[in-house]
């Protein structure tokens, strides 16, 4: 059995090719999903990649969440399909109501493009089960609206339920409580602002630490 991982492309998506390459790198079959698709083509998991979907008009992810393919993603996620949102994809998942909170302008209002260290705060998700608790990952961060914010009670709930998945070592964008990524209550949906798909081999990225997310979901799919 080969796991099929759907990779969504919206107008303005930049990192779909990189996400597909990461899926292939771990032995999965990437399946292209266009924003207007009305079905998910039988995939086992979905990646909503980074970029500037629909030009980030209104606000990042606000239009993409209404795309036909997202209707299918929301339904599939609520039935337990693993979904990963990276950067703009994280913003889309928050706009779609699959993850709590929102992403807003970085502190200082500057676009940040840096390799950053993350700590794995939870291994109890479909996308982080391969990691050791508190593992450190080196991955690229590239965003202008990457500051994670949520009401205090939501942040407390995320902390209390172990749903903070990644934290920044150095908080460059001002995210509340150093949060770089969070999960849904069932751990099947994960969003993070940095880019694991750009850290899949030392030749082209700062590390191969990002492969762990893709191996994790592959393990889950193959285990049935």
Curated annotation (Swiss-Prot):
Q: Mind telling me what this protein is named? A: Phosphoribosylformylglycinamidine synthase subunit PurQ
Q: Name one GO biological process term.
A: 'de novo' IMP biosynthetic process
PROSITE patterns referenced in this protein's UniProt entry, alphabetically: GATASE_TYPE_1
Q: What does this protein do?
A: Part of the phosphoribosylformylglycinamidine synthase complex involved in the purines biosynthetic pathway. Catalyzes the ATP-dependent conversion of formylglycinamide ribonucleotide (FGAR) and glutamine to yield formylglycinamidine ribonucleotide (FGAM) and glutamate. The FGAM synthase complex is composed of three subunits. PurQ produces an ammonia molecule by converting glutamine to glutamate. PurL transfers the ammonia molecule to FGAR to form FGAM in an ATP-dependent manner.
Recorded GO MF terms: ATP binding; glutaminase activity; phosphoribosylformylglycinamidine synthase activity
The cross-references to InterPro entries, in alphabetical order and at most eight, read:
Class_I_gatase-like, PRibForGlyAmidine_synth_PurQ
How is this protein organized at the quaternary level? Answer: Part of the FGAM synthase complex composed of 1 PurL, 1 PurQ and 2 PurS subunits.
Q: Give a yes or no for keyword Electron transport in this entry.
A: no
List the PANTHER family hit by this protein, alphabetically: PHOSPHORIBOSYLFORMYLGLYCINAMIDINE SYNTHASE SUBUNIT PURQ
Which species is listed as the source?
Answer: Mycolicibacterium paratuberculosis (strain ATCC BAA-968 / K-10) (Mycobacterium paratuberculosis)
Pathway assignment: Purine metabolism; IMP biosynthesis via de novo pathway; 5-amino-1-(5-phospho-D-ribosyl)imidazole from N(2)-formyl-N(1)-(5-phospho-D-ribosyl)glycinamide: step 1/2
| Primary localization class, coarse | cytoplasm
Reading the lineage from the top rank, the first entry is Bacteria
| HAMAP family, per database record | PurQ
| UniProt-annotated catalytic positions | 87, 195, 197
Compartments (UniProt record): Cytoplasm
């Amino acid at each position: 059995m080969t796991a099929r991982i759907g990779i969504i492309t919206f107008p303005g998506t930049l990192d779909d090719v990189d996400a597909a390459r990461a899926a292939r790198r771990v032995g999965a079959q990437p399946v292209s999903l266009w924003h207007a698709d009305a079905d998910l083509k039988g995939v086992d998991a979905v990646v909503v990649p980074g970029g500037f979907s629909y030009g980030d008009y209104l606000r990042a992810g606000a239009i993409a969440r209404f795309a036909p393919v997202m209707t299918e993603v929301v339904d599939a996620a609520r039935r337990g399909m693993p979904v990963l949102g990276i950067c703009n994809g994280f913003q889309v998942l928050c706009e779609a109501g699959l993850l709590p909170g929102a992403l807003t302008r970085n502190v200082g209002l500057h676009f940040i493009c840096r390799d950053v260290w993350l700590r794995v705060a939870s291994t109890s998700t479909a996308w982080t089960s391969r990691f050791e608790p508190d593992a450190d990952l080196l991955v690229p961060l590239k965003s202008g609206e990457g500051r994670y914010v949520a009401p205090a009670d939501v942040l407390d709930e995320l902390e209390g339920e172990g749903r903070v998945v990644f934290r920044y070592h150095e908080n460059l964008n001002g995210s509340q409580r150093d949060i770089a990524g969070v999960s849904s209550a069932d751990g099947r949906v994960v969003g993070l602002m940095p880019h694991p798909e750009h850290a899949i081999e030392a030749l082209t990225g700062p590390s191969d630490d990002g492969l762990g997310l893709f191996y994790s979901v592959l393990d889950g799919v193959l285990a049935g």
